[in-house]
Amino acid sequence: MADIKQFGLDLGIYGPLAEPEIVINLAKYAETAGFSSIWLADHVVFPKHFDSKYPYSATGGFPAPIEDPLLEPIATMAVLAGSTTDIRIGTAVLIIPYRNPVLLARMLITIDQFSGGRITLGAGVGWLKEEFETLNTADFALRGRVTDEYLEIFKSLCSGQEVSYHGETYQFDTVYSVPGSIQKPNPPILIGGIANPALRRVIKYGDGWLAVALDPIRMKERIETLKKLCVDSGRRFEDLELVYKIFINPGEPKKGPFGEREIGSGSEVQIIDDLKNILGSGFNNVVVRYRGDSAKEQQKQMERFTEEIIPKL
């Protein structure tokens, strides 16, 4: 049987339930129930009009109304660090190019300090070009290279020592970064994404991989690719933390980006089979997200997950 410590909970900080009291209460529930971690997605603003395609849906449309409430994840992490005591707090994922890399690193280091070393950085390159343009912090076309360099900067500033950096997209002369992060050499970095560049980024910069929206066939193929990259680079696959983020949608099955049934949608039996397959494929942790229409409904769904679904895994 699966252990609840194999599961994290995405708190849903965009959508109708993105309210401070609801988010804090759900975080406290997750800690009391025994979940290993709580997770936050990242958008700063949604442009009213955009042509960018969401990469994890069959239609390319974003799966939530863009005019719904939206909370910023780093500020929310700081609040949750003070509202909880033991549970880990992660981003799934933080869009690295959205923020100045030095300020981003210092904010995350500060939260790591206040939380007693409980943060995990799930890192992604982003997909919403129009949001990049609104924030005006990085060129969308260069987001992969920018992410790589910003992760290098993050790691160096976590050292708590004198740091300088001179890359292609960002440079600074020697600064003091004191204190460094509690977690050494830095808080764990999980690279989000399922394409080959993301897997290569896992090998070069990550402590693990954060996957989403993979059907069983592609899941197996992506893991085999990651194993091969580990062999080629001399890294141990067994040392990587593998995390899968799943949206739970009970009821009528939904279509995934390739027309297949979306993982996590359908009947209870189908959802249980999906979770068994994910855990059986080698993932260490599963981050679940229920979309409820109310705080009461979301709480009910999570109680059912912990009391009825997990014991069947």
Tell me what each language-model feature is.
Residues M1-L313:
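Active-site-adjacent structural elements that line small-molecule/cofactor binding pockets in enzymes
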